[in-house]
């Protein structure tokens, strides 16, 4: 049987026991299969969380051993009531399918070179990047690696061997070396800026596997119920923070610069002003922001120098109406209205000059952000007319409800769909209830969110390629869709049926904001690409990032507003 057939056979033996997922995508665009057991991410229940890794070598016998271990776990009396086991049973599927073991057929070797260097996930060894991130964010209490070999050996991380004496006395486990293997690297230092994992590695002949696993299941029965790994505890602590807690962290890092004037910085400036409105303990940033933009206001610096006049730059003023309200200085509001007037001139096809004539989805947000606010400030219907004509003429939404990147680019980019969700939420925020185009705008928006509902991962996240299983869970699309959900629920154009979708998005994002404002997997700046492969290969930023920080801050403040009102 093929690997896929083996997995299907395993799943058919106990329907519903595991959920088939993908934890990565190889260079040949083959999914790295993952079997998920349990509901919450990070896990909130009482069961201890196990993660099994097999097939790193790309050899059939190693994948067979991992699948046999899954069967043994499922049929062991009482074990699944105390432990939830998820697995990547063949972590090197290209090596297996292409006969390239232990390499992956693209010049990489998923069994070595951990932690993987550089940004993710576009190099010759994407399996290593995907596995490195995936294992940690399963919040495992124990990671078990299984591989075949002539001699039987158990190896455990220092933390694991300290947890329970029986790992040594029953399994005769020696200490796992701190090497460049996946388990060795996960067991030391700060993998993914999280504490190290508890790790065990079993090497044995196939004929000895059942006996060795039965020893392990017996030992695991003696692990204390409260034995949570540091990794799981850290992720649960992130999940336990309130949106205001997360907002305070983000506001300490982002929104303190506006050079150049661009939405990736301007949204964060707006986020700081919103946080001050929500949190009496957060110092009013208005004076500091006014001082920051003073060189622009005086004319000493240009707002939009040559080459910096696109929609992304104009949307860098989304804070201006809020600063005008906070300070009473109407010059900021006037600036925003003057900027909105740039949208009055059009390309030959009627698209406003600051926007791409092919109706790129990012321009939907830039246009809505500027023109919606200009209408709010002036009451001039012309701004709404330009905006709604752009949205309704775009025809970028497809029959399934999702959005292409533009009219000529048939790919469901994650942040592209985030831009679309955010743009319609912003438009509906400023559009009067009796506006003749409101029903059409709202219908598109609801159909989009309903489509996105079907692609929300169990972690709460949406992926870099929305309909691409195994592409990485991406931070900005989740924040933008989360914002649209929270705004719609607050303002009443979405019903309570969307609340669970929002809650899950918040949980996913919360786990991916560290205590210093670092973020997990923010797609770098991305123009129109020519293939799914090119979207998969856009670098995923891990750590501080102004784009991700800005959109996260908007989402968490909107989430805080939703919770305060409900």
Task: Label the predicted regions.
Residues 27, 44-51, 60-177, 187:
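Active-site/substrate-binding loop(s) of hydrolase catalytic cores
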Residues 34-46, 55:
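Short beta-strand-to-loop junctions in surface cap/lid or active-site-entrance loops
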Residues 155, 162-167, 176-228:
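Active-site-adjacent mobile loop/cap segments within catalytic or ligand-binding domains
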Residues 182-186, 234-241, 246, 253-266, ...:
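CBM-like carbohydrate-recognition segments
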Residues 298-408, 412:
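Extended ligand-binding groove/face enriched in aromatic
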Residues 361-362, 372-465, 471-482, 494-533, ...:
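Extended ligand-binding clefts on enzyme/binding-domain cores
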């Amino acid at each position: 049987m093929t690997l896929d057939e083996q997995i299907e056979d395993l799943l058919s033996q106990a329907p519903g026991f595991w959920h088939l997922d993908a934890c990565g995508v190889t260079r040949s665009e083959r999914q790295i299969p993952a079997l998920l057991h349990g509901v919450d991410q990070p896990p909130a229940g009482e069961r201890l969380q196990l993660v099994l890794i097999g097939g790193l070598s790309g050899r059939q016998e190693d994948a067979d051993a991992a699948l046999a271990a899954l069967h043994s776990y499922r049929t062991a009396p009482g074990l699944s009531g105390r432990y939830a086991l998820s697995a990547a049973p063949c972590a090197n599927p290209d090596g297996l399918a292409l006969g390239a073991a232990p390499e992956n057929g693209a010049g990489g070797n998923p069994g070595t070179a951990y932690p993987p260097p550089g940004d993710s996930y576009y190099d010759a060894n994407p399996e290593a990047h995907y596995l490195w991130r995936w294992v940690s964010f399963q919040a495992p209490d124990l990671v078990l690696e299984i591989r075949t070999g002539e001699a039987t050996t158990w190896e455990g991380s220092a933390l694991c061997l300290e947890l329970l004496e029986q790992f040594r006395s029953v399994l005769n486990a020696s200490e796992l070396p701190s090497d460049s293997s996946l388990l060795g690297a996960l067991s030391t230092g700060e993998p993914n800026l999280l504490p190290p994992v508890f790790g065990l590695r079993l090497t044995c002949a196939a004929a000895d596997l059942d006996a060795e696993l039965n020893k392990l299941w017996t030992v695991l029965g003696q692990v204390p119920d409260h034995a949570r790994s540091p990794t799981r505890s850290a992720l649960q602590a992130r999940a336990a923070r309130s949106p205001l807690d997360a907002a305070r962290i983000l506001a300490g890092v982002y929104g303190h610069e506006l050079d150049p004037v661009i939405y990736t910085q301007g949204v964060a400036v707006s986020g700081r002003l919103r946080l001050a409105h929500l949190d009496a303990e957060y110092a009013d940033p208005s004076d500091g922001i006014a001082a920051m933009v003073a060189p622009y206001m005086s004319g000493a610096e240009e707002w939009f120098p040559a080459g910096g006049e696109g929609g992304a730059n104009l949307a860098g003023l989304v804070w201006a109406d809020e600063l005008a309200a906070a300070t009473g200085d109407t010059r900021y509001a006037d600036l925003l209205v003057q900027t909105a007037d740039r949208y009055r001139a059009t390309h030959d096809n009627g698209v406003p000059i600051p926007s791409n004539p092919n109706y790129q989805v990012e321009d939907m947000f830039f246009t809505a952000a500027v023109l919606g606010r200009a209408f709010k400030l002036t009451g001039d219907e012309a701004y709404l007319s330009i905006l709604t004509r752009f949205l309704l003429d775009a025809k970028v939404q497809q029959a399934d409800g999702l959005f292409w990147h533009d009219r000529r680019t048939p790919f469901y980019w994650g942040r592209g769909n985030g831009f679309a969700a955010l743009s319609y939420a912003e438009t509906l925020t400023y559009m009067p209830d009796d506006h003749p185009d409101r029903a059409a705008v709202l219908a598109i928006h609801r159909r989009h969110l309903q489509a996105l509902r079907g692609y929300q991962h169990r972690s709460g996240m949406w992926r870099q390629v929305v309909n691409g299983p195994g592409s990485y869970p991406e931070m900005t699309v989740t924040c933008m869709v989360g914002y649209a959900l929270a705004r719609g629920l607050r303002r009443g154009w979405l019903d309570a049926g969307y609340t669970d979708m929002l809650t899950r998005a918040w949980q996913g994002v919360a786990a991916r904001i560290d205590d210093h404002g670092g973020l997990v997997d923010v797609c770098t700046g991305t123009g129109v690409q020519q293939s799914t492969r090119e979207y998969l290969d856009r670098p995923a930023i891990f750590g501080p990032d102004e784009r991700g920080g800005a959109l996260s801050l908007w989402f968490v403040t909107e989430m805080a507003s939703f919770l305060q009102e409900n």
